[in-house]
C-alpha cells in the first residue's frame, strides 16, 4: 500500500519521519495526492540516511510534502562508528542532498590519494582524523580485519569507505 506511511504518520501524529531516498524516489512517482489527503501537520522534520539523494525526489519531499518548510536532516554514519560522521542542521539553509557539517565531536575530512585534505569541488575519501566518543577498537574477535579495513589507508586516520565532496558554500 503506497499510502501506508502517510496514513501511519497522520494517525500517530509522527513528528520526525525517518525515510530513505529510495522510498521517496518511488513515492514521488505516485503523485502528490497520497500525502496531501492526510493531516501531516504534526511533522516537524524528515530524517534521512543510508544512501545519497538526487535532487528531484529531495525537492518533491521538501516542497510537496514538507510545504517548503520542513527540514530534511541528511545523516551519514555507520554502526562501526557508533553514530554519525556528517549531518544536516535544521537551523541552516537546506541544500538538496547535502550535509551541513560534521556531527559534533567528529573531525571529518575529505582526503585525496595522498591523504591530504581536498578543496571544495573535488571528490575524495570520507575520513575522520581524530578519535571520537564511541569509537570502536575492533571487530569482535577480528581486530586485524578492523585495522585493515579502516586504518590501513593513511597513518592514524580512520577511513569510512565512502566518497564525498565539499561544496563551495
Q: How would you describe each model-predicted region?
A:
Residues 101-105, 158:
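Short coil-to-beta-strand transition motifs
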Residues 22-25, 51, 131-134:
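Alpha-helix/helix-capping structural signal
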Residues 109-110, 165:
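Hydrophobic beta-strand positions
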Residues 1-8:
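ATP-dependent adenylate-forming carboxylate-activation enzymes
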Residues 92-98, 149-150:
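Short, P/G- and charge-enriched loop/turn segments at secondary-structure junctions
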Residues 119-121, 127-169:
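Conserved ATP-binding/catalytic segment of the ANL
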Residues 6, 14-19, 28-94, 107, ...:
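Gly/Ser/Thr-rich phosphate-binding loop
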Amino acid at each position: 500500500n503506497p499510502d501506508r506511511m502517510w496514513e501511519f504518520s497522520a494517525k500517530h501524529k509522527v513528528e520526525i519521519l525517518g525515510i530513505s531516498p529510495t522510498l521517496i524516489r518511488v513515492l514521488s512517482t505516485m503523485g502528490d495526492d497520497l500525502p496531501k489527503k492526510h493531516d501531516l501537520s504534526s511533522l516537524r522534520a524528515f530524517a534521512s540516511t543510508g544512501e545519497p539523494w538526487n535532487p528531484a525526489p529531495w525537492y518533491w519531499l521538501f516542497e510537496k510534502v514538507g510545504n517548503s518548510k520542513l527540514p530534511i536532516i541528511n545523516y551519514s554514519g555507520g554502526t562501526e562508528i557508533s553514530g554519525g560522521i556528517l549531518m544536516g542542521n535544521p537551523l541552516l539553509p537546506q541544500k538538496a542532498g547535502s550535509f551541513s557539517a560534521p556531527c559534533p565531536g567528529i573531525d571529518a575530512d575529505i582526503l585525496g590519494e595522498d591523504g591530504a585534505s581536498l578543496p571544495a569541488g573535488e571528490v575524495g575519501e570520507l575520513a575522520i582524523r581524530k578519535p571520537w566518543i564511541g569509537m570502536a577498537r575492533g571487530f569482535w574477535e577480528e581486530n586485524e580485519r578492523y585495522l585493515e579495513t579502516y586504518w590501513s589507508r593513511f597513518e592514524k586516520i580512520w577511513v569510512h569507505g565512502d566518497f564525498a565532496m565539499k561544496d563551495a558554500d
